[in-house]
């Protein structure tokens, strides 16, 4: 019986480029992601080298999005020269493992601007009425 990828026994070529990225699992309208290390050129449905975390993007009853990270193994693979996909880099930046990704700043700026516009639009409607 073979071991699961979470145990870190995946086969790979030593000189090939590695990437830490999300692999989508779950059902329709209910995504769930594994954060995995795999060879860069492989399809996400190919066998992975190692699973280093998981991410549930839909909020639970307490409005929490659950993330589990094996920071020791992530640091190991980054030390070995593994690349990061943009969503994985954003998540690791929010988690405090890396500097915050610039796209995270842009998303926060857009959200603040949209909230300010939504707040200002009822005031304009009241003043014109």
Swiss-Prot record:
- Family matches, as PANTHER family: 30S RIBOSOMAL PROTEIN S16, SMALL RIBOSOMAL SUBUNIT PROTEIN BS16M
**What family is this?**
Belongs to the bacterial ribosomal protein bS16 family.
Record's GO cellular component, any one?
A: mitochondrial small ribosomal subunit
Q: Which UniProt keywords apply?
A: Mitochondrion, Ribonucleoprotein, Ribosomal protein
Gene3D superfamilies registered for this protein in UniProt: 3.30.1320.10
Name of this chain's protein: Small ribosomal subunit protein bS16m
Q: Which HAMAP family match?
A: Ribosomal_bS16 (MF_00385)
Location comes to: Mitochondrion
Protein species of origin? Drosophila melanogaster (Fruit fly)
Q: How does it assemble?
A: Component of the mitochondrial ribosome small subunit (28S) which comprises a 12S rRNA and about 30 distinct proteins.
């Amino acid at each position: 019986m073979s071991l699961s990828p979470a145990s870190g026994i995946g086969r790979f070529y030593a000189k090939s480029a590695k990437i830490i990225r999300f692999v989508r699992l779950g059902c329709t309208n209910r995504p769930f992601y594994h954060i995995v290390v795999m060879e860069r050129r492989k399809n996400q449905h190919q066998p992975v080298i190692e699973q280093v975390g998981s991410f549930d993007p839909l909020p639970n009853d307490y409005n929490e999005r659950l993330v589990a990270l094996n920071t020791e193994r992530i640091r190991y693979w980054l030390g070995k020269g593994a690349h990061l996909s943009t969503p994985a880099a954003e998540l690791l930046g929010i988690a405090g493992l890396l500097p915050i990704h610039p796209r995270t700043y842009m998303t926060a700026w857009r959200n603040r601007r949209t909230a300010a516009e939504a707040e200002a639009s009822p005031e304009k409607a009241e003043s014109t009425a």
